[in-house]
Amino acid sequence: MPETHAILRGVRLSVDKGRLVADLIRGKKVDQALNILNFTQKKAAGIIRKVLESAIANAEHNDSADIDELKVKTIHVEQGTTLKRSAARAKGRGNRISKPTCHVYVTVGN
């Protein structure tokens, strides 16, 4: 069975926080991975759960895959563009605030 993937780009989440959750489900069966994500109390868990559900739906629709056989083959979180903002400080100065984004890649297969 071919591998199927789903990608979510530009998520307002730091890469380190996303990788923390991605490491929990790498290599697991999809039903077990969804169960882990449902009970993980992190912002990244909800985001990664949606991408995983999209990959499962892609496999079911495009490849007619059996959901019970699917496993999370690869999952990785890469750094995206950083949004740069400025914050006013005392005496007419300003500081830079960086708001990181990331890209989430999920591949499912047998």
From Swiss-Prot:
SUPFAM superfamilies attached to this UniProt entry: Ribosomal protein L22 (SSF54843)
GO MF term set: rRNA binding; structural constituent of ribosome
One Gene Ontology term from the biological process aspect of the record: translation
One term under GO cellular component: cytosolic large ribosomal subunit
Keyword list, A-Z: Ribonucleoprotein, Ribosomal protein, RNA-binding, rRNA-binding
Keyword rRNA-binding on entry: yes
InterPro entries recorded: Ribosomal_uL22 (IPR001063), Ribosomal_uL22_bac/chlpt-type (IPR005727), Ribosomal_uL22_bac/org-type (IPR047867), Ribosomal_uL22_CS (IPR018260), Ribosomal_uL22_sf (IPR036394)
Pfam families: Ribosomal_L22 (PF00237)
NCBIfam families: rplV_bact
Family label: Belongs to the universal ribosomal protein uL22 family.
Subunit structure: Part of the 50S ribosomal subunit.
Function in brief: This protein binds specifically to 23S rRNA; its binding is stimulated by other ribosomal proteins, e.g. L4, L17, and L20. It is important during the early stages of 50S assembly. It makes multiple contacts with different domains of the 23S rRNA in the assembled 50S subunit and ribosome. The globular domain of the protein is located near the polypeptide exit tunnel on the outside of the subunit, while an extended beta-hairpin is found that lines the wall of the exit tunnel in the center of the 70S ribosome.
Official protein name in the record: Large ribosomal subunit protein uL22
Gene field: rplV
